[in-house]
Amino acid sequence: MVKKMKNIRNFSIIAHIDHGKSTLSDRLIQKCGGLSEREMSDQVLDSMDLEKERGITIKAQSVMIDYKDKNGNVFHLNFIDTPGHVNFSYEVSRSLAACEGALLVVDSSQGVEAQTLANCATALEMKLSIVPVLNKIDLPNSNPEKVAREIKEIIGISALDAIRCSAKTGQGIEELIEQIIKKIPAPDGDEKKPLQALIIDSWFDNYLGVVSLIRIKNGIISKKDKIKVMSTGKTYFVDHLGIFTPKKINKNYLKCGEVGWIVCGIKNISAAPVGDTLTNAKNPAMNMLTGFKKIKPQIYAGLFPVTSDQYEIFRDALGKLSLNDSSLFYEPINSTALGFGFRCGFLGLLHMEIVQARLEREYSLNLISTAPNVIYQIEFNNGEKIYLDTPSNFPVDNKIRKIKEPIVECNILLPPKFLGPVMKLCIKKRGTEINMIYHEQQVSLKYHIPMNEVVLNFFDELKSVSSGYASLEYDFKYFKTVKMVRIDILINSERVDALTVISYYKNAQNRAREIVNKMKELIPRHQFDINIQATINNSIVARSTIKQLRKNVLAKCYGGDISRKKKLLKKQKDGKKRMKKIGNVNMPKTAFLDILNIHKD
């Protein structure tokens, strides 16, 4: 059946975590007969166990369903499910780039949240048509009128005629589909023009190699076509292509306006970069499509296997994981304390947790992560500039002219009664207030806060002081000159690189003392004294000693000459000295976790 362009609708779903996005997707699939009752399962599009368990969407997913309206016209709806969490905004931007419209789903019992606001701003920037949807109207505390006013006030979109629906019960789903057809424009494009296809996502399949999700902007792509990746110039033959309904359906061709998948025998995900353009090798397009900005890692942390014999499994696991996650960066490192491991770059703390959880669950690894760090910009007296993400490489000499740290703009939405504690928290985190706006039921706060403070445990503390009601969205803004110092931890005068941290100079002494005290609790006693020291610019600022274990060498000397006892004690003392010179401090690797999580205590 030949599809008419005017009968195609491409749209994404924008929503905060837990506002019912994945459930709404399930209802749309069910309503349009994408899956039978027997095949339906909760959160069809959330394929990872981790997605279902945490109740969040991590990867973008695409589905094409057919809907017959009251007049008998068949419409083809392509919708791309997007993640709602702040760490996965890169997935959202690339999903929106493939659409003409977006559903703005808001929980009618909770109202607008910060992440909804951020994703909606991205959609408006891309000039997409926004269809507001008030979900969960079946709940007793639902207040759609109030939430509709909130959407108008906070986001600036009229929502008085927004569809009221319940994804759980299916109420209002038919009206929603009619609104999608009415309000979201059909894609524009010309199938006679040279092929231009935007790569929305790529993932690795063990049997097929790299599978890419693409949106055809112009032209047609068919099986056996020779295609070219425009950024690299490399050519491949199309082996398979098709659509998801959400079952994988093979097809002979895809034409402009459609969203589908393609397999070209590519073995490495970097050969089909997300945001790139595919064109026909024989009749190439002149220009690449404007994709979306490539997101760089925001935080870095070291990951190490607890037992060294797992290193090779860990290396292979990271390689496989990075095939499905183009934003994950990693490089091998060697730590004197933790052995061989990898320095990994992540988009945020949740991204880091998800990656670590997947490595541990899917590959049965036992891992230790060092404290997350941000990138600092360092300018030397000779004008040279470098970017550093590893604390142990941080220079401590006098050649530094200035150190700059990344600042993020935090947008916080919260009920007015929690305003005081939240503002106190932002000030404690070295934040600068930019503005504050009172809405009918919520207050919108905008602060500039150092990223270093945000990535540690700002989100947890924010939820704590606001009883879980505040929502946060943050975005990198600029680098700001600041006085930072490096805290080194020494055990028996040996530096432990894994415990080196960068800290704001006013907090540095307290942080150093906390680490030293925690280490004293966690390191087991040895046959010799263990000296723990914290230094800032080579000056000791905190110190503690773990006293040696001593055997009572006088136990067998019931009486007798004092010189005999002195001789035994001297022999023990000499032995301890010798042991201290050659003895290694056995520090349990699990103790590192407690020390590195010190900021969460």
From Swiss-Prot:
InterPro entries in UniProt: EF-4 (IPR006297), EFG_III/V (IPR035647), EFG_V-like (IPR000640), EFTu-like_2 (IPR004161), G_TR_CS (IPR031157), LepA_C_sf (IPR038363), LepA_CTD (IPR013842), LepA_IV (IPR035654)
GO biological process entries: positive regulation of translation
**Subcellular location per the Swiss-Prot or TrEMBL entry:** Cell membrane
Q: Which reaction does it catalyse?
A: GTP + H2O = GDP + phosphate + H(+)
Annotated Gene Ontology cellular components are:
plasma membrane
Give one Pfam hit by family name.
LepA_C
Q: What is its main location?
A: membrane
Family affiliation: Belongs to the TRAFAC class translation factor GTPase superfamily. Classic translation factor GTPase family. LepA subfamily.
| Name used for this protein in its record | Elongation factor 4
Q: Which organism is it from?
A: Buchnera aphidicola subsp. Schizaphis graminum (strain Sg)
Q: Which gene encodes it?
A: lepA
